């Protein structure tokens, strides 16, 4: 698995991936269903963020992650992920509008062909973009989008 730590300077040979996007802080069954929907004709990638946005916005909060970035990368590699885009969640990324995130990061930067997110996915400054917004913005730029239904475990969404 190739690891990429920014959305800029991505090699042309890496562009065109089909990605699952989210925090994947535990890589549980719900995450795996999102990843499975991203599998297809294009190489499989993951777009995730480090640190977790919650750690960026509330660094004083107690630790909550089920696995650190290294354990997450190892788990994703075992699931057959070919490209891990572990984007730096910093003030620059946090300030992007949903439109700028799709245009600058997903389209111009990573050059993805397909993105899959969970139905509860939020993105952009102030979490102002929804999964539906992502689909609308991506489709306008030629990026196929799939919104995965939430997975339940004993009646509880995970």
Locate each region found by the language model.
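Nucleotidyltransferase catalytic core that binds NTPs
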Residues: 1-158
């Amino acid at each position: 698995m190739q690891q990429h730590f920014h959305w800029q300077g991505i090699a042309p040979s890496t562009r065109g991936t089909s990605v699952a996007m989210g925090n994947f802080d535990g890589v549980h069954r719900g995450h795996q269903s999102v990843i499975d929907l991203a599998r297809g004709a294009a190489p499989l990638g993951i777009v995730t963020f480090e640190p977790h946005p919650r750690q960026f916005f509330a660094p004083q909060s107690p630790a909550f992650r089920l696995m650190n970035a290294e354990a997450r990368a190892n788990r994703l590699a075992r699931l057959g992920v070919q490209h891990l885009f572990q984007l730096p969640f910093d003030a620059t990324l946090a300030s992007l509008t949903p439109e700028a995130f799709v245009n600058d990061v997903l389209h111009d930067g990573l050059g993805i062909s397909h993105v899959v997110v969970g139905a509860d996915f939020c993105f952009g400054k102030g979490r102002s973009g929804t999964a539906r917004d992502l689909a609308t913005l991506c489709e306008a730029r030629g990026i196929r989008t799939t919104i995965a239904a939430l997975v339940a475990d004993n009646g509880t969404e995970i």
